């Protein structure tokens, strides 16, 4: 028998809190929200109407107990529309890049499957010993010449691990590899507003955001960057295995993350989640300065690389914060191309006076 009561609003997303006990918390400005729980991807198991009695501030929360929901999936409904949770750990119907499925339901697993890390831990390579290699997961191995089995996926990067090691790099920096909305599939999109970062059009005439600097569900690895999301509800294994295999080669994993109007709470929760759940070694953040400083001074993240374009606040007691020297990127490209009058700028950006 299922028992339902008010939950913990501070514990956002869907969390298992005990044997057959689960907490759900969703922030929304509506007067009521409906929690939908599915047995698999199609069969609706139960509906929970969350009215004002389940609300604390703008957060609806409930605790469900009495039945095993470890393999169940969920989403929310507002004004007759099914919407995914911003804290969703996985997202269904996103397994094909730039394809919007008819009658798609964007559901998330409540509990992820266990993963054997075999004692893996973040590597904590000092900055002075680091060489970053920035890649787009899909673009890096999608070519016919990549010589990997699963092209454009996290598994493809695993197959390139020996090559990356031979290059002498110490870290791969992944351009957005969480569930960004490249095609405008999520219902919270404003139909009159185009996502930022557009560079070409999709097949159906929709704007396509290839790079990922746009709206996103930041807690879920990008399903279309895996080889198994079309048939597995929990496809997170592939990202975790990529991190584990790269760590075995002495290569760190840095996640590039773009935030716009997300709250400092969500941003911090997100970084913590990726560090604890996926063992990533650092993040390159784009976001509000106040949120960046909150992340940088978070004791949970005190040994996690936190990188951005500038810092204006207190430094951590461990040397884990860094400025991302974007100016060097443009200068060195022009210098290597042989553009005129680049030597002085190149010398500046390779000296201690860079960006001072």
Features from the language model and the residues they span:
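Conserved, mostly hydrophobic/aromatic
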Residues: 135, 164, 174, 274
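Active-site neighborhood of glycoside hydrolase catalytic domains
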Residues: 248-251, 258-315
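Structural beta-strand segments of beta-rich domains
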Residues: 20-24
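Conserved alpha/beta catalytic core and glycan-binding cleft of carbohydrate-active enzymes
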Residues: 279, 292, 296-351
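Aromatic- and acidic-residue-enriched carbohydrate-binding clefts of CAZyme catalytic domains
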Residues: 150, 185-248, 259-277
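The feature marks proteins involved in alpha-glucan
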Residues: 1-18, 45, 55-136, 141-148
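Short proline/glycine-enriched turn/loop motifs at strand-loop junctions of beta-rich domains
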Residues: 27-32
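A short, hydrophobic C-terminal helix/tail in secreted or cell-surface proteins
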Residues: 352-356
